[in-house]
């Protein structure tokens, strides 16, 4: 039995929840369309094209964000497309001002690998925490 797109995405979140970024990367295609929408001054905002780029993307997050709570709350199955609705609580670095935001992550999965990710969250809350 083949794995579904939702199962691949759930495995990625489970790995992330364990702090297992290599486990997440194992589920990402070598060539990928990985995008995160947000303030341009944040290192994880923009478009990334390879698994190595995505590894650097994950490494950049703790430079500016201390994620204190992260909850994928709903997985919406669209065949090869999976939309995830979630929430997080983050302390902005430097300074430590905390913000909470709901987020939307949209994935495309083919052949058991994530080939596209688009992430969006409340950029106003993030900007307010950063001053």
What are these regions (language model features)?
Residues 1-30, 128-131:
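Short, low-complexity N-terminal intrinsically disordered segments enriched in polar/charged residues
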Residues 1-4, 59-131:
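A beta-strand edge to alpha-helix "cap/lid" segment located at domain peripheries
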Residues 2, 21, 51-54, 100:
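A structural signal for well-ordered alpha-helical scaffolds and beta->alpha junctions
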Residues 9-12, 24-25, 32, 50, ...:
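Hydrophobic pocket/interface hotspot
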Residues 23, 29-79:
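A solvent-exposed, acidic/Ser-Thr-rich amphipathic alpha-helical stretch
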